[in-house]
Amino acid sequence: MSPTPVPDAEPARADAPAGPFQTRAGAYALIVDGGRVLLSSWQGPEHLVWTLPGGGIELGESPEEACLREVWEETGHTAELTGLLGVTTGTIPAEKRLRGEPLPLLTVQVLYTARITGGVLRPEVGGSSTDARWFDLAELSGLRTASWVTEALARAGVAA
């Protein structure tokens, strides 16, 4: 199965139509340990998608703070950021927005590497993710994953 953007985001293009749009910035952690990667799931409008632990950056919060908070919320683990992999972008057309939003959405994902420092694996309670799980890297080809999972693994030089 090929990577699927969340939710059905398309890569940003220089020839994208001009006009008003909204922006959502998020921060995500690639956590690899012993040939396994930690992922959290998100129920999209059409299917379940596995993604890196992470999510939206709140007002007044740094990307680093958001990333660590989201890892805790979605997985039950505390973590330490170990590196910056880079930034990716995508576009979700207005007609594919979740709650019928009238404007397209530019998504910006800040990607980090991290390592677990504590906590116990558990799914998020009352949040946007539905599960958290370690996967062997070899299992990833059979999963529906967000596009930035593949991007983060490639940037980190980790073969899936």
Q: Where are the regions that the model predicts?
A:
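Acidic, metal-coordinating catalytic segment for phosphate/diphosphate chemistry
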Residues: 1-30, 101-102
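A generic structural micro-feature
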Residues: 19-23, 49, 100-108, 126-129
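Short connector loops at helix/strand junctions that flank enzyme active sites
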Residues: 24, 32, 45, 52, ...
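Conserved Nudix-box catalytic region and its N-terminal flanking loop in Nudix hydrolases
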Residues: 33-77
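Nudix hydrolase/Nudix homology domain
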Residues: 42, 47-50, 120-160
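A short coil-to-beta-strand element that immediately follows conserved catalytic motifs
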Residues: 78-87
